[in-house]
């Protein structure tokens, strides 16, 4: 069903918030297409394609380092804090324990201020040319905020170049895609992949194309969206405050549509008889791996040396590529056995910290394990 309290059964065409599965189902696909066309090289500096990074400590970071999560860029940054009016509340915004002004629980040991406002110059209640970035119902960000995020990333101090999974890496890759293609990334993906592949249930900003009732709700009361149910708006804060189209999250889709992308990849760039990517590009991105982590070029992979830390079933071969998402999603493609495994859920409903059994019980790897065990019989 859609939720614990609902008797509405999930249909095969109902859309889920993919969360970080967006990275490989959207952003990486666009990156591979532009690489295929010779628009950049993996050792190119990202600052060649994002002028805002020139003169910062990110200037020498390469595209390959972003894809491998070895850029030195921090894992996360709370961009949304810049939009909050600090004069609208007293004391701290967060507290480890509830008190008279902190009743809203957002994590196991974290509570947020009950009442706060957004800066009026950055957030409006209605859409306009100056406020086009929709964050939720009756919440529209100023058009300048998206560009300010790139400036903020440029100012964040760079750390060492060890492996550090970071959503910011893929936010930068999305910016690169748009600067090279001269198109919004969602429209680029529609044109190059989603429309010709008949992925009719895949979209950024899904409420522009689908009814709310066709989209599975993600959380019941999001504190940054004034306690509203999130249904059709991306849950990830960074993607939300980019206006819903981001490189790290924002895509909504179905299991059937997601499977098409990974079938395309293990079939060497061909889907339903049409070529979308060269075999050489697919081979490179599917086989290139980091020397210091389990990661591939944008893809996550099994940890063959540590099954406890591996995101995949122990039986999954090292050739497997894919990704997971915070909302309870994953997709894994196995070119060796020619298998595609996709699992979508809204495991963070009603509150992200309430239902962690999907991770604690390793449900996703165990489901994948059943598939491999059946294959071995």
Residue ranges and their predicted role:
Residues 1-9, 42, 131-143, 331-334, ...:
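A short, well-structured edge-of-sheet supersecondary motif
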Residues 1-18, 39-41, 151, 155, ...:
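Short, conserved catalytic-motif segment at the N-terminal edge
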Residues 9, 56-60, 157, 290-293, ...:
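Extracellular/periplasmic catalytic domains that process cell-envelope and extracellular macromolecules
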Residues 17-43, 170-178, 258-261, 265, ...:
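Active-site SXXK
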Residues 18, 22, 27, 165, ...:
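Hydrophobic (often cysteine-bearing) scaffold residues that line and stabilize catalytic clefts
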Residues 42-56, 196-197:
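Short, glycine/proline-biased beta-turn/loop segments that scaffold the active-site neighborhood
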Residues 59-318:
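Short, surface-exposed loop or secondary-structure junction motifs
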Residues 269, 323-377:
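Structured C-terminal helix/loop/strand segments within mature extracytoplasmic catalytic/sensor domains
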